[in-house]
Amino acid sequence: NSPGTISLGQGVVSYPPPPQAIEQISQFLAIPDNHKYQPVHGIVPLLDAIATKLKSENGIDINDNQCIVVTAGANMAFMNAVLAITSPGDEIILLTPYYFNHEMAIAMAGCTPVLVPTDENYQICLDKIEQAITDKTRAVVTISPNNPTGAVYPQAALEAVNRLCCDRQLYHINDETYEYFTYNGVQHFSPGAIPDGSDRTILLYSLSKAYGFASWRIGYMVIPQHLFVSVKKIQDTILICPPVISQY
């Protein structure tokens, strides 16, 4: 009702999906096998394309200790992660202000979100994270670029969180949904590029923001290999397989 007003209430981009994606739909529909269930963790061509993207854009070379799982968006990736690494009563650390869906997913899993403040510039306070860790803590969640603040965490800060998680045998969950939304020369860094950190690092990605695929429900996660069986069981139970039409 207010022409020209920009809504900051939800992360909805102003542009549509790429034309070539829309053009592919009719071709997809014409192939009978495309209407059957596909692999729980994603189709091979997309998994290969994601691996290439991670290497060229994020500095992540997928190794034998890691695997990619295609999901129905980053929210599902987070839910998969929480269910795979926790038991009811466990705790997960969220930095404030936090993304509300993360809190809801943690609560749905019967766990407790532990809220840790950031500084006056919405940057990470490592000492406060350390103080919040208990014997029930299972993970620390970072979002960079951040939703809702827009803050981008420097490489050194993310490395410090990742190192802390590795030292304390916690998981570092980094949500990179807004990886392309950086400005004024600020660069996005993925903790997945940290050497020797892959065993405790979980990365979440979404195609909703980068490509305008919000209603297509498509995203992916990078997880340690030892979580693969658990995540596949969770995703098979909830979804069976990610939307096949969106994977093409």
Label each residue range with its predicted role:
Residues A84-I106:
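Conserved PLP-anchoring active-site segment centered on the Schiff-base-forming lysine
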Residues I194-Y248:
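Conserved core segment of the aminotransferase class I/II
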Residues L8, I25, I50, I68, ...:
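Generic structural signal for small/hydrophobic residues in well-ordered secondary structure
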Residues S2, A109, D167-R168:
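Helix C-cap/helix->beta junction micro-motif
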Residues E120-Q187:
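Active-site phosphate-binding strand-loop segment of PLP-dependent enzymes
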Residues I62-I68, P88-E91, K136, S198-T201:
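Short acidic capping loops at alpha-helix termini that bridge into adjacent secondary structure
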Residues N1-A72:
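N-terminal small-domain helix-loop-helix segment of the aminotransferase-like
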Residues M108-V114:
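A short helix-loop-beta submotif of the ANL/AMP-binding
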